[in-house]
């Protein structure tokens, strides 16, 4: 990003922070997260707008160690809208502390059995800089979102593109790999699993990211439950993550600054990592990993009627996960769908 643009964005962010800090909180006590906490996190809380009032649903001093089901307050507050076969999305208004006083979370659920998933990359002609943005997403994308973390111009860790290993696995105790196999199924591999070459066979696409937000049984990692374990549990930023629901669908969540509307939504104010892990769990994720949020986080949802919703970032990124219509499904081929409908109508005569 040019220096002038960075300066302007920083200045706007500073002005916004002052305005948010001057805004009194509007939270009301309500139902807390599930019991069973051994948390020693710094004090913080999250509330959700129900349409009538703010309802507190999570507190750091009562943070659960495990998420086994969606939280009632979150499930009741979000209204899911169908974008296409196998894809639905919704939004939540959240209230936290400090610069997270007003947030919006955009959530997308994807059924990998009903769409095709692939990784897209984009770099400048010489390969010196990353170049992908939601504006450049392929025209047939139903969902497009930046994935992984990256170092300079390249993604961090393991990357498989179209069945070929592009980058070798990275190492880290809180890393998770997300794999799309040749049949279109999605599986998750923990930090120790990639050492086995057999696990890396039959992979169509894969990326690696960190930190893990929820392990396979919905457990919150120890490093996210108290300070001093390798994760900054106080830092606030815009967040992006991907998770797996109990029924195998994918959950993608992007947080946006919401004090002044979407025009300033890309300002990197947001929840802490423990708060974001709680949001993923409260939306039903049983396993989850953070992606590159901050000024990188960006996502697109395109409805079947052509309506496009885009949440833009401030920075170009090297890689994105794209969901598009499954070529074997009639809904991807309007003419085939019309013929099927006519045949079905004839059968009823």
Language-model segments: which ranges?
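Zymogen propeptides
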Residues: 23-172, 176-177, 185-188
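Short, solvent-exposed aromatic-acidic interface loops
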Residues: 122-128, 192-196, 254-260
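A short, polar/proline- and glycine-enriched secondary-structure boundary/capping micro-motif
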Residues: 128-132, 197-203, 261-270
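Conserved, well-ordered active-site substructure
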Residues: 154-172, 176, 180, 228-287, ...
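Bacterial N-terminal signal peptides
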Residues: 12-20
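A cross-taxon signal for low-complexity, glycine/charged-rich
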Residues: 4-8, 335-339, 346-349
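Leucine-biased recognition of intrinsically disordered, low-complexity hydrophobic segments
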Residues: 17, 31-32, 41, 339, ...
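Active-site-adjacent helix-turn-beta-strand microarchitecture at beta-sheet edges
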Residues: 148-234
């Amino acid at each position: 990003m040019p220096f002038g643009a960075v300066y302007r964005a920083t200045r706007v962010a500073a002005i916004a922070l002052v305005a948010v800090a001057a805004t009194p909180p509007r939270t009301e006590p309500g139902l807390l997260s599930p019991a069973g906490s051994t948390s020693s996190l710094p004090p913080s809380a999250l509330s959700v707008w129900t349409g009538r009032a703010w309802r507190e649903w999570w507190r750091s001093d009562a943070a659960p160690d495990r998420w086994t089901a969606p939280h009632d307050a979150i499930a009741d507050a979000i209204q899911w809208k169908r974008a296409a076969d196998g894809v639905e999305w919704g939004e939540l208004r959240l209230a936290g502390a400090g610069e997270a006083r007003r947030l919006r979370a955009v959530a997308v659920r994807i059924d990998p059995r009903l769409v095709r998933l692939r990784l897209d990359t984009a770099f400048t002609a010489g390969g010196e800089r990353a170049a992908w943005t939601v504006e450049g997403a392929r025209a047939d994308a139903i969902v497009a979102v930046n994935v992984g973390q990256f170092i300079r111009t390249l993604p961090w860790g393991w990357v498989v593109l179209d069945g070929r290993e592009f980058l070798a696995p990275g190492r880290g105790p809180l890393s998770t790999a997300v794999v799309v196999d040749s049949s279109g199924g999605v599986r998750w591999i923990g930090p120790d699993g990639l050492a086995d070459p057999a696990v890396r066979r039959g992979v169509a696409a894969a990326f690696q990211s960190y930190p893990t937000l929820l392990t396979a049984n919905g457990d919150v990692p120890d490093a996210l439950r108290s300070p001093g374990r390798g994760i900054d549990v106080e830092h606030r930023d815009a967040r992006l993550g991907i998770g797996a629901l109990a029924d195998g669908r994918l959950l993608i969540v992007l947080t946006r600054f919401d004090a002044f509307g979407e025009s300033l939504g890309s300002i990197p104010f947001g929840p802490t990592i423990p708060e974001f892990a709680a949001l993923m769990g409260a939306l039903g994720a049983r396993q989850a990993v953070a992606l590159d949020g901050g000024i990188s986080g960006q996502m697109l949802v395109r409805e079947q009627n052509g309506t496009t919703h885009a949440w833009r970032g401030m920075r170009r990124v090297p890689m994105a996960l794209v969901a598009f219509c499954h070529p074997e499904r009639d809904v991807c081929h309007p003419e085939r769908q019309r013929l099927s409908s006519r045949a079905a109508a004839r059968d009823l005569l």
